[in-house]
Amino acid sequence: MLLPQPMARGVIVQRYKRFFIDLVLDDGREITAHCPNPGAMLGLKDPGLAAWVSWSGDPRRKLAWTLQLVEADGGLVGVNTMNPNRLVAEALAADAIPELSGYAMIRPEVKYSEASRVDFLLTHPDRPPCWLEVKNCHYRRDGTLAEFPDCVAARSAKHLKDLAAEVAKGARAVQLFVIQRTDCNSFAACEDLDPVYARGLSHAAAAGVEVLCYRCDISPDEIRISRNLPWRDAPAI
């Protein structure tokens, strides 16, 4: 997936009100950018970190700049939570995720419970439907382990129950974690920050929900899904 251009590099000054982030660009300009990430962004919003922002000339926008990447731990980390669904849509269209290849139709944002929409519904005349939920992951604190979530994620825990309900009806259901960083070699649910979600993921897997974890290759020009990572499952409690 090509990132919007032009891009500019700068240094983070502060993030505030969740969706605003001030930076000083390398050319000296002081800007306020949209931060398209409602999460805690642990270790990725600290003053002094280098970051990359894209510029839009759309006059309807209140903020012309959008935060896309942060330089952390010697590499680039994708922090735009809108991008994982775009990455997955592109990968599905190209059959670039072997476990999810071969479906005849890919439908985004399909309602599958009273108050939920699944990210993608994959269908084929000769297969059960596949309900696919996508989560962005960019938290790392221990070696090469990627963790999700980085804060309490009650809505994400509900999605796991919705996926398990589809499996009970005879469908296939997949929870896909898109890891927007290049320095991780395995994945785990973050038990201490959200034990309810960690237990929910284990219970969902025991109920037949498949868990996939894919790492990305990242540059200031492009992000693409590249490599399957193992899931280090925590025992259900």
From Swiss-Prot:
Signal peptide: none
InterPro entries: SfsA, SfsA_C, SfsA_N
Pfam families with a match to the protein in the record: SfsA (PF03749), SfsA_N (PF17746)
Gene3D superfamilies (alphabetical): 2.40.50.580, 3.40.1350.60
Superkingdom as given in the UniProt entry: Bacteria
Sample GO molecular function, one term: DNA binding
Transmembrane segments: none
Family assignment from sequence similarity: Belongs to the SfsA family.
PANTHER family: SUGAR FERMENTATION STIMULATION PROTEIN A (PTHR30545:SF2)
Family annotation (HAMAP family): SfsA
Listed name of the protein: Sugar fermentation stimulation protein homolog
Source species taxonomy: Bacteria, Pseudomonadati, Pseudomonadota, Alphaproteobacteria, Caulobacterales
